[in-house]
């Protein structure tokens, strides 16, 4: 049997692995155009939304590693707004910029519009979310980093 190309995640602080992966997705979205052939650049939306999901999940992994629990059940995948609220219940500092814009990106992510052709009323230009995504990555990093 061949060894895996990539070793399994065995870091003593797995939340850092989740956050590093979030940054990879965010970095790939940088510089991509918002519109391609007259259509929204759906891969850019996917990269941004997935970066957000992984960054939020880094907070959840951090809490789980520390033995913390939030009230209620963890929200399902792809509902970025609910995941963010859950992470805030675990101590992540709420950010008004993120709250204002996350609902729109969450809707696109939750309905898989960026992955599969579907009709969705109004779609915001992906670069409108850049500042909120960067703020979220900064906030989650501040929350999980080892001091």
Model-derived features: where do they sit?
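Helix-loop segments that flank and shape redox-cofactor active sites
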Residues: 27-43
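Short N-terminal helix-initiation segments at or just after the protein's N-terminus
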Residues: 20-21, 58
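Short, hydrophobic, well-ordered secondary-structure elements
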Residues: 41-61
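Long, charged low-complexity segments
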Residues: 1-20, 26, 64-147
